[in-house]
Amino acid sequence: MVRTRLAISVVLVSTLLLLNVKAKSVDPYKVLGVSKDAKQREIQKAFHKQSLKYHPDKNKDKGAQEKFAEINNAYEILSDEEKRKNYDLYGDEKGQPGFDSGFPGGNGGYSYSSSGGGFNFGGPGGWQNMGGGGGSKSFSFSFGGPSESSFGFGMDDIFSMFSGGSSKGKEQFGGFGSSSNAESKSKSSTVAAIKTINSQVYKKDVVDQGMTWLLLSYLPSQRGSQYHESIIEEVAESLQGALKVGRLNCETESSLCKQLGIVPRRAPRMFVYSYTSSGKATLAEYTEELVAKKVKSFCQEHLPRFSKKIDLNTFDVSAVSSQKTPKVLLLSTKKDTPVIWRVLSGLYNGRFVFYNTEVHDTSDPKIQKLGVDKFPAIVGWLSNGEKQVLKTGITVKNLKSAVQELGKLLEGLEKKNKKVSSKSQAGQAPNESSEKIPLLSRPNFDSICGENTPVCIIGAFRSSNGKEKLQSIMSKVSQKSLSRRQASTTGSQDTVSYSLLDATKQSAFLSSLDKSEFKTSSDKLLIAYKPRRGKFATFKGDMTIEEVEKFVAAVLNGDIQFTKTRQKPQIK
């Protein structure tokens, strides 16, 4: 029996030696097709191009799987500065001369890795498992390992592969290891920009921060995570300042994955954490081809959209400036809302009301009235109606610096607005109000009476006298503490808004609520409207400050019965 075991071991060792002699040392620079002074960006691009070409899921040629493994081994060396340095000096990423230079007796040695139906010889730190089909696994043997054996594993390990003998190799991985072991060694330097997400990080850095995230969910045993991460890195680099990236291990963070509704599959999954126009966070999965350009486009599509595009011909500046939150307007030659502005609208959502408009001619009287002489430009309004030209002829170095610089401009405007608001409150008598109730129009309707506002108190008038009466009453009532009660969820937006409506011009708006009730000779009426629920209630009492205040209080306390609208009301 001993002789039989010895004979088998001699045959196996001889075979391994023969294969190692035949295995040529592969130049990772040649594999990726880059020069020896190539920068990381060039290496990344070359890796993406080659990986896409030879990925086993797309390329069914016999040599594709082997070539794919070769490409991944090359990238593992060149993407790690320490391994690359060692390879340049010694021809081996571990800092030891390669096998071709003489059989080393210390730690290390390298010959290229290939993938097939059996074993995978070579590979610097365990077995690679990037891609590949048919459920096959690849193993690496490290020639020139520790003093225990020049092959990195003992004789017991050889026999345990066939007969389940010693478990030593399985526990310590000897000359063959698992994917999680191999990946953990290489990821620390190659994907440092990708943040590891756990429950605490998710709550602190991701939730309700206004920033869009590209998240990778994976299991350590899955194939392809390195390729996914290289794609994510490239996208993150091109969208720095607009996008943050993270990876979520659904094995160690199973509860968080379950909370997010992420179910692990055979391959890693990509999700974009973003915000809808209503402010609600969503998690959208990317399911298309793994190409950086397409992933980037997907991320851009899911950037915040809190800025409302307006037409300067119908933009009511007086209505905008009467609101309490500062307003900012971007004037640019772009048809679509610029990426920078969308990012800022997410980061500062709730602190500003964002608008943008497409412009081309600085000689336009409306542009000149705003005080803008160059595009792009940003104009702001304080809560007291004061206009501020924040910047004109804006130039930026890159997306990240642009978001930072323009963010500082917005924060400066916010500070001015706080000073103006505090002075206004300090100098205002208890029964005095300078609050001007805005007139509802198409540009300001969403910000005043959109779905983000729980209740709108609308004063409809048919004459100038009716308008003045409503303006006086509503401005005083709106300053009362109960009538200004804030939503507890945000603390930044009033539960109730106040506005005026020209009933002669907006008869369709009233008809959409109730076709018959508002056909009256009265020159003024008061309506409470709930946009989210599509319901309304009409004030029936005497039009006095006291009675209107009671009506608003009853609305907020839930003591008023609301009726379903005929259809969703719209402003002409």
Curated annotation (Swiss-Prot):
Keyword Coiled coil applies: yes
Domain of life: Eukaryota
Tagged with keyword Amino-acid biosynthesis: no
Disordered, as annotated region: 419-439
Tissues of expression: Expressed in roots, leaves, stems, flowers, mature pollen grains and growing pollen tubes.
Subcellular location: Endoplasmic reticulum lumen
Reported induction: Induced by tunicamycin and heat shock. Induced by DTT and azetidine-2-carboxylate.
GO cellular component: endoplasmic reticulum lumen; plasmodesma
Signal peptide: 1-23
Descriptive protein name: DnaJ protein ERDJ3A
Organism (species): Arabidopsis thaliana (Mouse-ear cress)
